[in-house]
């Protein structure tokens, strides 16, 4: 079972107060419901491939409203041939949609979120929970990128959803138009964790955070190793260049031509090619020399080698 499926399964087992029940149902019916008329009677079908969500919708309807509700199971005949669960509302459908602020009763639908539904903080959380159950998905935190999104068919609802997430919970949600609708999405791991907490997915939150901590620690270690490797490669490259320059000087004019301070460092570098500048400074006979002091002398040796290669004269008095 995917992380998103486990999260939704957890949410379908939560207890809910009546005011919150209305907010959650409003999101579920608005986003997954369809309306039809037959013989002057309105019917609402709420369709999902998730059995737990279908049971949740059925339970919320039976618990909170006096409506005729049925549950059907059908099998898809194409692609994956999964079961499709349909919660059908017949008697009382019109009054239910009005109470959930989905339908005005004048054959026009309300696509944004009514303030009447989300007066309380708990109801705001419940609406987001219903929206996630109806059209949400979240990446497994072990994958390469963090991503949570909620799909809406209508732009007005998508905009209202994003506003709810940002103005009341400061989630830094963004919106995006897709081919068949719109999404509100989160990309920051901290905000996704906050969202899971807001909608009551506490077990999913704990798993998300556990995986995120391990992943972040692994990434930190990898960055540290990469940094150390880069520094080591840089040090080795510099040492090899220094040795090459010293040997070139030795072959052309001889190391004895160098001033004493440079000659000493040149010989130490040839003898100890794998040590750091700090370690090299501790080997100087006249006393310890700082890393910057050793680096200064080696740069002077590099300059002498470059002038010799270019056929230019070398002023050893300026090389100290």
Curated annotation (Swiss-Prot):
Molecular function GO labels: DNA binding
Keywords: Cell cycle, Cell division, DNA-binding
Signal sequence residues: none
InterPro entries: Homing_endonucl, Sporu_reg_WhiA_N_dom, Sporulation_regulator_WhiA, Sporulation_regulator_WhiA_C, WhiA_LAGLIDADG_dom
Pfam families: HTH_WhiA (PF02650), LAGLIDADG_WhiA (PF14527), WhiA_N (PF10298)
Disulfide bonds: none
Gene Ontology annotations of biological process type: cell division; regulation of sporulation
Entry superkingdom: Bacteria
DNA-binding region, residue intervals: 276-310
Family: Belongs to the WhiA family.
HAMAP family, per the entry: HTH_type_WhiA
General function of this protein: Involved in cell division and chromosome segregation.
Protein name (database record): Probable cell division protein WhiA
Organism of provenance: Geobacillus thermodenitrificans (strain NG80-2)
Gene behind this protein: whiA
């Amino acid at each position: 079972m995917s992380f998103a499926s486990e999260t939704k399964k957890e949410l379908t087992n939560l207890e809910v107060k009546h005011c919150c029940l209305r907010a959650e149902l409003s999101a579920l019916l608005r986003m997954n419901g369809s309306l039809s008329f037959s013989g002057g009677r309105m019917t609402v079908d709420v369709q999902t491939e998730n059995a737990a969500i279908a049971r949740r919708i059925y339970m919320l309807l039976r618990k909170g409203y006096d409506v005729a509700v049925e549950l059907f199971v059908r099998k898809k005949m194409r692609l994956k041939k999964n079961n499709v669960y349909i919660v059908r509302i017949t008697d009382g459908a019109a009054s239910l949609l009005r109470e959930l602020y989905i339908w005005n009763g004048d054959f026009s639908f309300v696509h944004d979120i009514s303030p009447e539904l989300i007066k309380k903080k708990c109801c705001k959380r419940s609406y987001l929970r219903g929206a996630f159950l109806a059209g949400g998905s979240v990446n497994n935190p072990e994958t390469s990128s963090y991503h949570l999104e909620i799909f809406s068919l209508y732009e007005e609802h998508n905009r209202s959803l994003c506003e709810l997430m940002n103005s009341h919970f400061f989630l830094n949600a963004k919106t995006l138009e897709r081919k068949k609708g719109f999404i509100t999405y989160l990309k920051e791991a901290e905000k996704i964790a906050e969202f899971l907490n807001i909608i009551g997915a506490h077990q999913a939150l704990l798993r998300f955070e556990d995986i995120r901590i391990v992943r972040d620690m692994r990434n930190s270690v990898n960055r540290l190793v990469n940094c150390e490797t880069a520094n080591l490669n840089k040090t080795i490259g510099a040492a090899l260049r220094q040795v090459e320059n010293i040997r070139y000087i030795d072959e052309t004019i001889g190391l004895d031509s160098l001033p004493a301070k440079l000659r000493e460092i040149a010989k130490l570098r040839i003898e100890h090619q794998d040590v750091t500048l700090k370690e090299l400074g501790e080997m100087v006979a006249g006393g310890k020399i700082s890393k910057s002091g050793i680096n200064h002398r080696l740069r002077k040796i590099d300059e002498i080698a470059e002038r010799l290669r270019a056929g230019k004269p070398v002023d050893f008095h300026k090389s100290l």
